[in-house]
């Protein structure tokens, strides 16, 4: 069995997923869809980059990461329906996404969370105190962290409002006020 995994080439998490998949399962991976038994549309929104003849003649798995209901009308819904005619199975990372796409397809939907790369996401050897010291952050300071990418992808300027940057800011304001009443400084670390 040979698998071609479609990367969006957007310098985003899906590109890393494809790279990690290909690195860990290289014996199953091919670099061109014509050589594959299965085409994995890990970046499902890029499906039309694959020639239709391959989509018709291969097994196709599409990963749907999430649907934004407010955006899933018109073009996005038409695009989903056009792609659905080629998809044999959907992969989604959570039940919420499964519930969102179920009304739009009769194809099987497999819920499987994304993996975590332990070489990237792990505890630092330094203690929290050592990290605070290295960053010049007082031990008593209350820290709030955010590492999500909140842009639309086609540029790094347009906010991705469904990720709730407004809600994050509201929560930060509330925490800052609460901590100030307690006499504690609060800071936000963005990555």
Segments predicted by a language model, with ranges:
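N-terminal pre-catalytic "stem/leader" segment of glycosyltransferase-like enzymes
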Residues: 1-52
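Short beta-strand segments
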Residues: 5-7, 40-43, 113, 145, ...
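Conserved alpha-helical elements of sugar-nucleotide-dependent glycosyltransferases
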Residues: 10-21, 93, 160-171
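Active-site proximal beta-strand in glycosyltransferases
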Residues: 35-43, 53-71, 90-92
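A short helix->loop->beta-strand "cap" motif at the edges of active sites that frequently abuts
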Residues: 55-60, 87-88, 106-108, 184
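Membrane-proximal helix-turn-helix segments that form the acceptor-binding/catalytic region
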Residues: 71-90, 104
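Donor nucleotide-sugar binding/catalytic pocket of nucleotide-sugar-dependent glycosyltransferases
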Residues: 88-100, 106-125, 137, 147
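Conserved catalytic-core segment of nucleotide-activated headgroup transferases in glycan assembly
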Residues: 124, 128-191
């Amino acid at each position: 069995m040979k698998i071609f995994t479609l990367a969006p080439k957007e310098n985003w998490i899906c590109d890393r997923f494809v790279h990690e998949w290909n690195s860990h399962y290289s014996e199953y991976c091919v670099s061109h869809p014509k050589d594959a038994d299965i085409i994995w549309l890990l970046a499902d929104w890029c499906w039309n980059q694959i020639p239709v003849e391959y989509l018709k003649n291969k097994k196709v798995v599409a990963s749907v990461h999430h649907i934004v209901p407010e955006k899933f009308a018109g073009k996005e819904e038409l695009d989903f329906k056009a792609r659905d005619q080629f998809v044999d199975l959907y992969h989604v990372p959570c039940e919420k996404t499964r519930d969102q796409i179920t009304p739009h397809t009769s194809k099987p939907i497999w819920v499987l969370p994304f993996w975590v790369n332990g070489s990237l996401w792990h505890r630092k050897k330094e203690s929290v105190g050592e990290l605070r010291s290295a960053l010049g952050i007082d031990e008593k300071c209350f820290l709030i962290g955010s590492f999500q990418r909140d842009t639309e992808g086609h540029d790094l300027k347009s906010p991705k409002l469904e990720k709730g940057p407004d809600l994050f800011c509201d929560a930060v304001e509330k925490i800052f006020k609460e901590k100030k009443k307690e006499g504690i400084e609060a800071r936000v670390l963005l990555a």
